[in-house]
Amino acid sequence: STPIKSSAASDVYKRQGFIMAKKELQVSAIENGTVIDHIPADKLFDVINVLGITGMDNAMTFGANLKSSKLGKKAIIKIWDKFLEDDEVNKLALVAPSAKINIIRDYDVVEKKTVNVPEKVEGIVKCMNPKCITNHEKVRTKFTVVKDSPIVLKCHYCEKLTDQEHMEMN
């Protein structure tokens, strides 16, 4: 990260509760919650949107364009006092299949999860076929994952294929 040279800027960071050490901003550890790591840098805002976390009252930290040996650049999300439900993990897997989830309790990582693309996807993704029954009636969408890297889904009703690039979440 770029060192902050202005003492005025440094004072602002100190007043806002950040700790300055070795010319880097240190983000505090979370006591309880979820850390989503290894998000491709260009998928950060997709993950934020698909998980609907902008509407939460929980404290959150987002890091973008961080160095990563695996991804080149990555993003990270820390959410205090929030643990992802199965459907949220499935949504995450569709948007950022390389993501890793760390469950934090009492400041310790108590569980590490690798995100896996599910075999079946229900009620999460919209069918791209405008003639599909799911776009005209109150029918829950159902897809089979045909390919998981890059992700390709097949609609249960009309058999239309949808790739990851064109996926639209419900």
Language-model segment annotations:
Residues 5, 58, 151:
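Residue-level signal for beta-strand positions within conserved beta-sheet cores that form or flank
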Residues 17-113:
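Interaction interfaces in information-processing and related assembly proteins
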Residues 109-170:
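Cys/His-clustered metal-coordination modules, chiefly Zn-binding fingers
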Residues 1-16:
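Single conserved hydrophobic/aromatic residue that forms the stacking wall/gate
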